[in-house]
Amino acid sequence: MAKYFTSSHSKYLLKVHIIFCVKYRKPLLVRFGSQMKSIPLGVAASSDFSIEVMEVDKNHVHMLISYPPTLSVCSIVRRLKQLSTAELWRMYPNYLAKEFWKERTFWSDGYFACSTGDASSETIKKYIEQQG
């Protein structure tokens, strides 16, 4: 049975499967694999959402995120992308300047988001775990 969260005026269970890609689909996540798990987990720890499961492929990241109704999916993605880009540029400025021609970017502009709907969290978790 699903565990619902309760706040002062709502009861909810909101989960979304999010995927975002490296700009130009560059296979850079192989190089940054360990940071690509720790950075988003750190962002989530200081935010109102949580990352239940995450897998990193060579050029994209899959996440299953649980969040309250006060947040939008867009704001979650924006926060994850902005803070991870800033942290990666802080750690690897010379390498990233060569890869992106000094444009301070890392992620492509778009993202994929899908509410989990009728699929169980376990089904989504298994799918994401098989992606890396």
Roles of regions detected by a PLM:
Residues 1-132:
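Basic nucleic-acid-binding interfaces
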